Regions:
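Sec-exported extracytoplasmic/periplasmic mature domains
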Residues: 37-41, 45, 50-57, 98-101, ...
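Short, aromatic-enriched amphipathic alpha-helices that serve as compact interaction elements
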Residues: 25-41
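Short solvent-exposed beta->alpha transition segments
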Residues: 30, 45-92, 105
Length: 137
């Protein structure tokens, strides 16, 4: 009888380890959109910037002022409102983002219209519409 709790704990630990090693079953589209959404939800805009299409990042690099503005924002909600494929294999997505300005503590909501393109060479989706514009209502 004394061995049963130890056996149970060992079995649970093995099951948890097996779950942690299970390969991702998400497709590249869902994986990219989910990871980007997590970055925005946690106000990790440097991580979200990594999802922006590289040519767009070169044309419009983030300025120091823009990075400082992102630091003033705390995202409180990120809700998918709609998603539709595009004829070229990309994706259009509309998201409602709730945020608080850390200085004023005022919450507001913006609607972010995202455009994503599939990159067959990199085998991933890139955000072609840029990061959300928090300067508008």
């Amino acid at each position: 009888m004394k061995r049963f709790p130890g056996f149970l704990i060992a079995a649970l630990a093995l099951m948890l380890a097996a779950c942690a090693m299970a390969p991702s079953t998400m497709n590249p589209q869902d994986e990219a959109l989910d990871q980007y959404g997590v970055a925005v939800r946690w106000s990790e805009f440097a991580d979200a910037w990594a999802f922006v299409d590289p040519p767009l990042r070169q044309l419009h690099p983030l300025t120091e002022l823009e990075m400082e503005r992102f630091k003033q924002i705390q995202v409180t909600g990120y809700d998918l409102k709609g998603r539709a494929p595009t004829p070229d294999g990309g994706l259009e997505q509309t998201v409602e983002i709730r945020l608080i300005n850390r200085n004023t503590q005022i919450e507001r909501t913006i609607v972010d219209h995202q455009s994503w393109r599939w990159d067959p060479e990199a085998k991933r989706y890139w955000l072609t519409s840029g990061l959300p514009d928090f300067t508008t209502n």
